[in-house]
Swiss-Prot record:
Record keyword Cytoplasm present: no
Co-factor(s): Zn(2+)
Lineage: Bacteria, Pseudomonadati, Pseudomonadota, Gammaproteobacteria, Enterobacterales
Family: Belongs to the RNase Z family. RNase BN subfamily.
Subunit structure: Homodimer.
UniProt binding sites for Zn(2+) 2: D68, H69, D212, H270
Protein name per its UniProtKB record: Ribonuclease BN
Annotated source species: Escherichia coli O1:K1 / APEC
Free-text cofactor note: Binds 2 Zn(2+) ions.
Gene this chain is encoded by: rbn
Binding-site positions, Zn(2+) 1: H64, H66, H141, D212
Catalytic activity, EC: 3.1.-.-
List of catalytic residues: D68
GO molecular function: 3'-tRNA processing endoribonuclease activity; exonuclease activity; zinc ion binding
Length: 305
């Protein structure tokens, strides 16, 4: 998987940062797909500056209904339809997301020529497609807001083909059954258990993408042990009280959570427009003083998971 940041500014766009949108490229060998997390104003234009086709977009997750995370959605939905894309799309978001989308389309005389499903969520598991699952956690923000934990299921270990050949198992369809952990019977009556010829399963990757939030009870469970944690760092340490009063977090709080949760990497985003490039580096230094494995997301930055 890889993350592509399409927008990294808090509240309003700046000359160098658009408002929030994060693309997740699943990079699965047999199931291509793109997921979008939040869709601030101008997201579809940001997408044009990448190599990714909106037709590959099959899921959109909205954290909350503040405009800097939402106002790009109607335009993206309509442009996707006008481009002749017919692949289905599912939107997940808090209560009110259905009314917002349906009202925007109705009042503007717009529609989609592809199947569009809108799922209003609460806290808990959203879905499990057999390859990965997504769970929503409640954030601390003035509006109903969620963070998302994306977990790949463990992958089966490699099949020991040499040992199977030595045991007299012919290569072919039987290998596929054994790789699935099944038990087969050979012509000579012997039973071969696939589990005996599989290496240790390969652990799946885990990712936490926080919505806007101040410190909250669910944060640790959402982030615990993930490979990558994406978290806002709207303001610096000196402005922590102001950040919290508005349902946001400081650099110190994001980094301290990453350390406590034992994450592999912290990526900070949702930077206040008060910070220029020099100020953003100040935010990064504050985080790294607490959690060294921190990166600052800029628009169009790409991170592997």
């Amino acid at each position: 998987m890889e993350l592509i940041f399409l927008g990294t500014s808090a509240g309003v766009p700046t000359r160098t940062r658009n408002v929030t949108a994060i693309l997740l490229n699943l990079q699965h060998p047999t199931q291509s797909g793109l997921w979008l997390f939040d869709c601030g104003e101008g997201t579809q234009h940001q997408l044009l500056h990448t190599a990714f086709n909106p037709g590959k977009l099959d899921k959109i997750f909205i954290s909350h209904l503040h405009g800097d995370h939402l106002f790009g959605l109607p335009g993206l939905l309509c442009s996707r339809s006008m481009s002749g894309i017919i692949q289905p799309l599912t939107i997940y978001g808090p209560h009110g997301i259905r009314e917002f989308v349906e009202t925007a389309l109705r009042i503007s005389g717009s529609w989609t020529d592809y199947p569009l499903e809108i799922v209003e969520i609460g806290a808990g598991e959203i879905f499990d497609d057999g390859l990965r699952k997504v769970t929503a956690y409640p954030m601390e923000h003035p509006l109903e807001c969620y963070g998302y934990r994306i977990e790949e299921h463990d992958k089966p270990g490699a099949l020991n083909a040499q040992a199977l050949k030595a045991a007299g198992v012919p290569p072919g369809p039987l290998f596929q059954e054994l790789k699935a952990g099944k038990t087969i019977m050979l012509d000579d009556g012997r039973q071969i258990n696939g589990a005996d010829y599989l290496a240790v399963p390969v652990p799946g990757k885990a990712l936490a993408i926080f919505g806007d939030t101040g410190p909250c009870d669910a944060a640790l469970e959402l982030a615990k042990g993930v490979d990558v944690m994406v978290h806002e760092a709207t303001l610096d340490m000196a402005m922590e009280a102001k950040a919290n009063s508005r349902g946001h977090s400081s650099t110190r709080q994001a980094a301290a959570l990453a350390r406590e949760a034992g994450v592999g990497k912290l990526i900070i985003t949702h930077v206040s427009s008060r910070y220029d490039d020099k100020g953003c580096q100040h935010l990064l230094r504050e985080c790294r003083s607490i959690f060294p494995a921190t990166e600052l997301a800029n628009d169009f930055a790409v991170f592997s998971i």
